Amino acid sequence: MDLTPLTQALDQHRTVEVIGNSGAGLTTLAAQAHNEWPGAAVVQQDATAHVSYLRDTVIEEVALGLEQRGTPIPEMRRRCERVLSAAGLTELAERHPAQLSGGQTRRLAIAAVAVLEPELLLLDAPFAGLDPTSATHIIRLLEA
C-alpha cells in the first residue's frame, strides 16, 4: 500500500481523518503506517485490547507507559492529569479499569497512548459505537 498521500497530508495538517467503508483496508493502512513511522502509536477499534487491567486504577493504567520509559514522577503526574481531564476521566481516576463502560474504556485506551505523546497517533474507528459525550471527550483529548 502506497503511503505517499498520507505522508503528504500529514506534512500539511496536524490531524488527518481517513474514512472508508468496512473492509476498505483502513485497519491494514493503520498497521502499515505504524510500521513505517517508528514514532507512531496505534489504538485499534477494540479498546479492551489496549487496556492491561493489571493496574488497580485508571490513573495507574494511564501512567504505565510513562513508568516504563522512566518518566520522572512530577512529569508523569502532570501528563496523566492533563490527559485524564481531556478524556473526561478525572472523576474515574481511582476506579478499577474493569469497572468502566465501553465508551470510558475506549477513552482510557486512547488516553494511555496519547499520554506518551507519540509522533503519530493512529486511531482505528475511534468513534464507532460511541455516544456523543464520549465522542466529544475523544476529540478534546486529541486536541489537548
Model feature map: region roles:
Residues 74-92:
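Conserved ABC ATPase "signature" region
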Residues 96-100, 104:
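Conserved ABC ATPase signature
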Residues 110:
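Hydrophobic anchor residue at the start of the ABC signature
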Residues 117:
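Conserved catalytic motifs of ABC-family nucleotide-binding domains
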Residues 121-124:
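Catalytic Walker B motif of ABC-type/P-loop ATPase nucleotide-binding domains
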Residues 127-128:
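Short loop immediately C-terminal to the Walker-B catalytic DE motif
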Residues 131:
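ABC-family nucleotide-binding domains
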